[in-house]
UniProtKB/Swiss-Prot annotation:
It is found in: Cell membrane. The lineage of its organism: Bacteria, Bacillati, Actinomycetota, Actinomycetes, Micrococcales. It is a multi-pass membrane protein. Gene3D superfamilies: UbiA prenyltransferase. Keywords: Cell membrane, Heme biosynthesis, Membrane, Transferase, Transmembrane, Transmembrane helix. Converts heme B (protoheme IX) to heme O by substitution of the vinyl group on carbon 2 of heme B porphyrin ring with a hydroxyethyl farnesyl side group. GO terms for molecular function: protoheme IX farnesyltransferase activity. This is Protoheme IX farnesyltransferase. PROSITE patterns: UBIA.
Length: 320
């Protein structure tokens, strides 16, 4: 890391005082540290991947173990991230109300909570699914906390490209939970999310560019002009859509998935090119950038819903 992080228990904001909040508010503060919206997005890919790998519904016990274990792993990584980044979170309007900044949770409490969630996630995946999924869960935590948060985030504009790989682990965990191995279709889904991350996150960093500049975090959307960022968004969007279609020959996907991948991909490419056109004309706005950000979430959701439905309708277009 390029910036020192205090390890004391002194809150970054003196209000509210420790012990002055009720149980309900404390619970909400702990929940906020886990970044529940990020967890929701990660879980969108987990169950559909399990269904596709099984070519049907896995057992309820396996589904619950994988979803809960995966959520705990993501939550643990989120809390560690909030703990490490609490010095810069106070400098950004987007993150200034996080519990470690307001003092609702102390750094020591957050650190203990992160370790508990991490240990619980590995145990749940190990005994509820299999050791391979547990190792992948541990890998996801380490990758997000060490590779992204501690090494890349404050040092390079490519931080979200490589650090974002941690967000691709849920599909590997899901596939491994069902098959006890990692096969090529899982790798393709991993790469879809890997290529999806930049066009998802960079428009957000355009919207909050001033925040990142104040915190000296070199997100591409904050340090490069809209023209440069929009080109990168378009390139990654095309690569993502092309990669998604590999599930047809590699994963044996059928017509439901194929139609969704083509239609949703075409729509997202249109939105990406619209952002590019506005940026090249010097007419890009925060609203336009956020439209692509929200559109990327809709794209991924539609793609994985189709992945879940596909095994129940028709057969593979190309041999399985």
């Amino acid at each position: 890391m390029t910036a020192a992080v205090s390890t004391t228990d002194t809150p970054l904001n003196a209000s509210p005082a420790r012990g002055s909040i009720g149980i309900s508010r404390k619970f909400k503060a702990y929940l906020a540290l886990t970044k529940p919206r990020v967890i929701e997005l990660l879980l969108v890919s987990t169950l559909p991947t399990m269904i596709f790998a099984q070519r049907g519904f896995p057992s309820i016990g396996l589904i619950l173990a994988t979803l809960v274990g995966g959520a705990f792993a993501a939550g643990s990584a989120g809390v560690f991230n909030c703990y490490i980044d609490r010095d810069i979170d106070k400098l950004m309007h987007r993150t200034e109300k996080r519990p470690l900044v307001t003092g609702e949770v102390t750094p020591r409490e957050a650190l203990v909570f992160a370790w508990i969630l991490g240990a619980a996630s590995i145990a749940i995946l190990w005994f509820g699914a299999n050791p391979l999924s547990a190792w992948l869960g541990l890998g996801a935590i380490v990758f997000y906390v060490v590779i992204y948060t501690m090494i890349l985030k404050r040092r390079t504009a490519q931080n979200i490209v490589w650090g974002g790989a941690a967000g691709c682990f849920p599909v590997l965990i899901a596939w491994a939970a069902v098959t006890n191995t990692v096969e090529w279709p899982a790798i393709v889904l991993f790469m879809v999310i890997f290529l999806w991350t930049p066009p998802h996150y960079w428009p957000l960093s355009m919207r909050y560019g001033e925040d990142y500049r104040n915190a000296k975090v070199p997100m591409l959307g904050a340090i490069a002009g809209a023209k440069v960022v929009s080109v990168q968004v378009v390139l990654y969007a095309w690569a993502m859509v092309a990669c998604s279609l590999l599930m047809v020959p590699v994963g044996g996907a059928g017509w439901v998935y194929t139609i969704a991948a083509v239609a949703a991909g075409a729509w997202f490419l249109y939105e990406s090119h619209a952002l590019y056109k506005r940026a090249q004309g010097g007419d890009v706005s925060n609203k336009g950038a956020m439209k692509v950000f929200h559109g990327s979430i809709s794209y991924l959701t539609l793609l994985f819903i189709a992945l879940a439905v596909d095994p129940f309708v028709g057969s593979a277009i190309v041999g399985s």
